[in-house]
C-alpha cells in the first residue's frame, strides 16, 4: 500500500522510494532461492481516476525497470548493477468515497483498456464509507460497485477480482467468525475478504479457523442485483440524516474518542472525509475510535440516519440488503435505551423511532456497562473512562 500523490502531496517521494524497492526485494528473494517476485501488487488508496493508476504503472515500467538499458559511462545500468525484476507490477485501486465507488467500473475499465491482463483486482473500502455516509449507505455503495464491476468483467472478458475491507463491528461490515456465512451471502462476487484483528484474536482459535474455512471453501458467484436509482435515492436521504445526527453528537464523540485505547499508529489521509474527517466545520476521529465511542455508550452507529427512511423505503432496502434486519438486530444487543433517551437535539427520538421497525435484542449487562461509560464521560472526573470503554469492548468482542 503506497501513498497517493494526488491526495498526499507531501508523501509523493515515498511512493517512488517504494517502487524502487521492488526490484531490490526481488534480488533478496532470488538470493534465497526464490524465483517468484515477493512484491508484484501495489494498492493505491483513495483512487479516483484511471490516470492515477496509469502514472504508477508507467513510472515503474519506464523509470524503475526502464533505466536498465540507460548507458552510463562505458556500460548500461543493468550491466553495472544487475537486472531489474519483475518487469511490471499490478496496480490495485482502493476506492473509498461515493464518487469513486460509483464509478469504479469506469476507473478500472479505462486503466485495463489496451493492456493484456488476465485479471484485475479492485479494493472496495467499507469502514470509511460508513464513517462518511452511514453504514447502510456503505453497504449499498459496495453492492452497486460490485454490480458494475461484474458488468465490466462480462464486457471486457478480464476477470475482475474484488477485495472488500470489512471489520467485525456491524457498523464496519459485521464480518466475524460467527457471521462469515452471512457476509458471503451478502457479497457473493467478492474474491477476497480482509480479516481485521478482532476476527483473528478476539474469538477462540477453533471458531476463527472455522470462519476462515467457510470463507475459503465458498466459491464466487454473481453479485446480488440492486436498483441503481433506488440505491442513490436511499443513500441521499439516509446519508444526509446521518451527517446531521453525527454533527449533533460530535462533542460527545470527541470526548469519548480521546479516552479510546490506542491500538495502532496510522498516518492521516489528508482530504478524505473519513480520515482527517471534517463535517460542517466539525472534525471527527477515524473509524475505529468513532464507532468505539458510540458503541461504548450503547448507541449502535448503524442506527444513525435510518430515521429519514419511510417504511416503504426500508422494505426496498430489505430487497437489496438481505441481512439488513439481522445486522440491525445484531447491533441492538449493544443498545442502552436509557442513554438513547439522554441524547441531544432529537437524535434519541429518531433512534427510538427506528427501533420500532426492527427486532430489538438489548443485552442487560451490556446496557448497564454502557450507562456507566456515559456517566463517567459526562462527569468532571474521567480518570476511569478508558477502563469503562474497554469493559464494553470486551463484552462485544471488538473495539470499534
Tell what function each PLM region has:
Residues 191-192, 200-400:
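Acidic, glycine-enriched catalytic cores built around paired aspartates
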Residues 64, 156-159, 298:
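Glycine-centered loop/turn motif at secondary-structure junctions
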Residues 1-121, 191, 290, 310-400:
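Catalytic alpha/beta active-site cores
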Residues 57, 146-150, 291-295:
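Predominant activation on well-ordered alpha-helical scaffold segments within soluble catalytic domains
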Amino acid at each position: 500500500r503506497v501513498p497517493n500523490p494526488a491526495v498526499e502531496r507531501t508523501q509523493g517521494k515515498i511512493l517512488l522510494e517504494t517502487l524502487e524497492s521492488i526490484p531490490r526485494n526481488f534480488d533478496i528473494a532470488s538470493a534465497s532461492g526464490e524465483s517468484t517476485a515477493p512484491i508484484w501488487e501495489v494498492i493505491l488508496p483513495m483512487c479516483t481516476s484511471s490516470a492515477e493508476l496509469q502514472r504508477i504503472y508507467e513510472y515503474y515500467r519506464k523509470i524503475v525497470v526502464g533505466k536498465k538499458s540507460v548507458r552510463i559511462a562505458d556500460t548500461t545500468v543493468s550491466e553495472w548493477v544487475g537486472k531489474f525484476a519483475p518487469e511490471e507490477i499490478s496496480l490495485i485501486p482502493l476506492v473509498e468515497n461515493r464518487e469513486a465507488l460509483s464509478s469504479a467500473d469506469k476507473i478500472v475499465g479505462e486503466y485495463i483498456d489496451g493492456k493484456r491482463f488476465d485479471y484485475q483486482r479492485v479494493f472496495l473500502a467499507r469502514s470509511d464509507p460508513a464513517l462518511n455516509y452511514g453504514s447502510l449507505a456503505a453497504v449499498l455503495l459496495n453492492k452497486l460497485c460490485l454490480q458494475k464491476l461484474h458488468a465490466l468483467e462480462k464486457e471486457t472478458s478480464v476477470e475482475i477480482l474484488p477485495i472488500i475491507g470489512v471489520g467485525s463491528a456491524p457498523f464496519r461490515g459485521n464480518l466475524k467468525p460467527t457471521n462469515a456465512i452471512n457476509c458471503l451471502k451478502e457479497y457473493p462476487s467478492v474474491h477476497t475478504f480482509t480479516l481485521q484483528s478482532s476476527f483473528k484474536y478476539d474469538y477462540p482459535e477453533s471458531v476463527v479457523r472455522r470462519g476462515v474455512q467457510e470463507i475459503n471453501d465458498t466459491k464466487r458467484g454473481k453479485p446480488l442485483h440492486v436498483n441503481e436509482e433506488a440505491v442513490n435515492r436511499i443513500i441521499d436521504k439516509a446519508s444526509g440524516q446521518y451527517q446531521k445526527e453525527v454533527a449533533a453528537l460530535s462533542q460527545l464523540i470527541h470526548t469519548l474518542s480521546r479516552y479510546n485505547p490506542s491500538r495502532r499508529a496510522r498516518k492521516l489521509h489528508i482530504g478524505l472525509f473519513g480520515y482527517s474527517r471534517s463535517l460542517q466545520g466539525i472534525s471527527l476521529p477515524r473509524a475505529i475510535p468513532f464507532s468505539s465511542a458510540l458503541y461504548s455508550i450503547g448507541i449502535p452507529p448503524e442506527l444513525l440516519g435510518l430515521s429519514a427512511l419511510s417504511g416503504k423505503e426500508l422494505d426496498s432496502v430489505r430487497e437489496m440488503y438481505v441481512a439488513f434486519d439481522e445486522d440491525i438486530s445484531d447491533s441492538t444487543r449493544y443498545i442502552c435505551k436509557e442513554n438513547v433517551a439522554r441524547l441531544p437535539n432529537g437524535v434519541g427520538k429518531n433512534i427510538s423511532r427506528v427501533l420500532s421497525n426492527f427486532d430489538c435484542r438489548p443485552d442487560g449487562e451490556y446496557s448497564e456497562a454502557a450507562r456507566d461509560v456515559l456517566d463517567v464521560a459526562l462527569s468532571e472526573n474521567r480518570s476511569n473512562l478508558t477502563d469503562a470503554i474497554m469493559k464494553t469492548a470486551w463484552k462485544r468482542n471488538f473495539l470499534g
